[in-house]
Amino acid sequence: MRDIKKFQKTVWDYYNQHKRDFPWRKTKNPYHIWVSEVMLQQTQTDRVVPKYKAFLKQFPTVRSLASASQKDVLERWQGLGYNRRGLNLKRAGEEIVGRLKGKIPTEVDALMALPGIGDYTSKAIITFAHNTPLVFIETNIRTVFLDYFFQNTHVLVHDREILRLVEKTLDIKNSREWYYALMD
């Protein structure tokens, strides 16, 4: 097993040289982060940037999203594909405004109870909005860990094994930025 400290240094060094600039990385607003996370599911970042900006211009708050028509949400979602994501975003917004008095939950289970929000998305929202050190993986993070720690193996590596490494390497003081570094 390769050294954890060396891995962390490698990731931070790369990030400091190649950090990508996205609008959702400049906010701690959980609604904005949630919108970005849903848009980024199976969609390239370059395609998401203009859609994200336009969506938030039309629906700047969870209340504005909840009160919008399905038609307006789907028109703004056009070009991202998987319309169900946009519809779930609206339905979850309606629940947040109605049942949760407009407050986006800060607990994983409460977020996962909303339409369209799973384990990764719930933890990403909390981590990126509140810098809470939660353990999660997505495709890019998985690839980084496989390439670094399992580069010479041809064995199937289970997510639980990768999650243990994610937990060991997590920068608990700056988890938000650490995950951005892993994704870059």
Tell me what each language-model feature is.
Residues R2-D3, T10, Y14-D184:
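Catalytic cores of DNA base-excision repair glycosylases
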